[in-house]
C-alpha cells in the first residue's frame, strides 16, 4: 500500500488499473444472467464480502469459461483481497498469470477484429493492472513497458465511448489527469508533451456520465469524482455526495468509510464521526487502524480539544504506518499536519516545526500542502 512518486504515465495508468471488466459485446450483453452475476460479484468485492464474491465468480466461470472479463474480474477480486500484493507471495504469481491469460484471449479476439471495443477495454485494463503490480514491487522497467502498451489502448478508447459507456471512466480520467497532474507537479510537464491534450472540465463530465451510464465502472467514477473534488479541486462540498454514496452503498468497505471521514473533517462536520472512526481503529488490519488513529487525532484535537490525547493518536498512527508497509504519503501529510498543528497549540514550536515539514514533504496535493506551509511560517 505504500505509494511513491511515479511518472505521469504510471500515475494515470494506476487510475485505469481500477477499471472493472465491462461486458458489452462478445456474446455477454445479451446474457442478462451474466450481467446480473457480474454486478453482484463486483458489489460483493467492493463491500469486502469475499465469500459471496467467490460463489458468484464460480458461477460466471461455469457459464462463460475463460472469457477475459471473468479473468479480469478475478484479478479485481485479488487486488482487494490481497492488497498489497508482494512479489514473494503466491498471490503475485496468480495475479500475473490471470492478467497474462486475459491478454492472450484478447489478442485472439483482436486478431479477428482489431477494433473490437470490449477486447480493447479488457487489454487496456490488463496492462494497467500489470503496470501497477510491477511498479508497486520495484520492477520499474517492466512497469513502464506495460504502461506504454496500455496507453495505445487508451487512445483507441476515445473513439469507442459512444459504443461502450465503460470508456467514460478511463477517458474521463485521462482528460482530467493529463492536464491536472503536471499542473500540480511541474517537473513532469516536459515528460508528457507527446501525449494528446486533455480537458479537465470534459474529464469531470465524462466521469459524471460514467457514474450514471456505466454498468461496471460507475463505482470508480464515483470514487474519482470524490477524489478530484476533495483533493485536487479543493471543493469538499462537491465531493461529499460521492463520499456519502460510497459509504452507504458499501458499509463494510473501510476505505470508503475513511474517505467519508476525511471529507467531513475538511468541512468541519464532526457529528456522527466517532463511531466510524472507532470502526477503523477496531479493524484487524494495521492499514485501517493507521487511518483510524489519524482521524481520531483530529477528533480529539478539534472536537474534544484534548491535545495530549490527539498527540497520542497521531503517534500511534505514525507507529502503525511502519507496520506491514502500510504507510501512504497522502495520509502521512494529514497525520503530520495535525501533529504539527497540535504541537503548536501546546507551545512546542520545535516539534511543531519538524512535524509540519514532514507534512509538506509527504503532501501530494496543493490543497493539503498549502495549509501546512502557511502554518509553518506563522
Language model segments and positions:
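TPR alpha-solenoid repeat register
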Residues: 70, 119, 167, 220-221, ...
Amino acid at each position: 500500500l505504500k505509494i511513491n512518486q511515479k511518472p505521469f504515465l504510471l500515475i494515470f495508468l494506476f487510475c485505469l488499473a481500477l477499471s472493472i471488466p465491462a461486458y458489452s459485446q462478445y456474446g455477454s450483453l445479451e446474457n442478462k444472467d451474466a450481467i446480473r452475476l457480474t454486478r453482484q460479484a463486483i458489489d460483493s468485492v467492493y463491500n469486502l464480502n469475499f465469500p459471496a464474491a467467490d460463489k458468484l465468480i464460480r458461477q460466471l466461470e461455469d457459464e462463460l469459461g475463460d472469457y477475459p472479463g471473468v479473468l479480469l474480474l478475478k484479478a479485481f477480486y485479488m487486488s482487494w483481497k490481497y492488497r498489497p500484493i508482494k512479489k514473494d507471495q503466491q498471490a503475485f504469481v496468480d495475479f500475473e498469470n490471470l492478467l497474462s491469460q486475459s491478454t492472450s484471449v484478447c489478442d485472439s479476439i483482436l486478431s479477428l477484429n482489431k477494433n473490437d471495443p470490449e477486447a480493447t477495454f479488457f487489454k487496456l485494463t490488463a496492462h494497467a493492472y500489470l503496470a501497477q503490480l510491477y511498479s508497486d514491487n520495484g520492477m520499474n522497467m517492466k512497469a513502464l513497458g506495460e504502461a506504454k502498451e496500455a496507453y495505445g489502448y487508451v487512445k483507441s478508447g476515445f473513439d469507442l465511448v459512444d459504443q461502450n459507456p465503460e470508456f467514460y471512466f478511463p477517458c474521463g480520467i485521462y482528460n482530467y489527469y493529463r492536464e491536472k497532474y503536471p499542473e500540480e507537479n511541474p517537473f513532469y510537464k516536459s515528460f508528457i508533451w507527446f501525449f494528446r491534450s486533455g480537458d479537465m472540465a470534459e474529464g469531470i463530465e465524462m466521469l459524471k456520465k460514467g457514474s450514471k451510464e456505466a454498468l461496471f465502472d460507475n463505482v470508480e467514477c464515483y470514487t474519482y469524482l470524490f477524489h478530484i473534488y476533495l483533493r485536487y479541486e479543493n471543493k469538499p462540498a462537491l465531493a461529499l455526495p460521492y463520499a456519502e454514496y460510497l459509504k452507504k452503498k458499501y458499509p463494510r468497505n473501510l476505505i470508503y468509510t475513511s474517505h467519508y471521514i476525511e471529507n467531513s473533517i475538511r468541512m468541519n462536520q464532526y457529528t456522527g464521526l466517532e463511531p466510524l472512526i472507532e470502526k477503523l481503529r477496531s479493524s484487524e488490519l494495521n492499514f485501517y487502524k493507521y487511518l483510524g488513529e489519524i482521524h481520531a487525532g483530529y477528533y480529539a484535537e478539534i472536537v474534544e480539544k484534548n491535545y495530549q490525547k490527539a498527540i497520542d493518536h497521531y503517534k500511534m498512527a505514525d507507529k502503525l504506518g511502519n507496520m506491514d508497509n502500510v504507510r501512504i504519503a497522502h495520509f502521512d501529510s494529514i497525520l503530520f499536519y495535525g501533529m504539527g498543528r497540535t504541537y503548536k497549540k501546546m507551545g512546542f514550536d520545535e516539534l511543531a516545526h519538524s512535524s509540519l515539514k514532514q507534512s509538506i514533504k509527504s503532501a501530494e496535493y496543493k490543497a493539503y500542502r498549502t495549509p501546512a506551509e502557511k502554518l509553518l511560517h506563522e
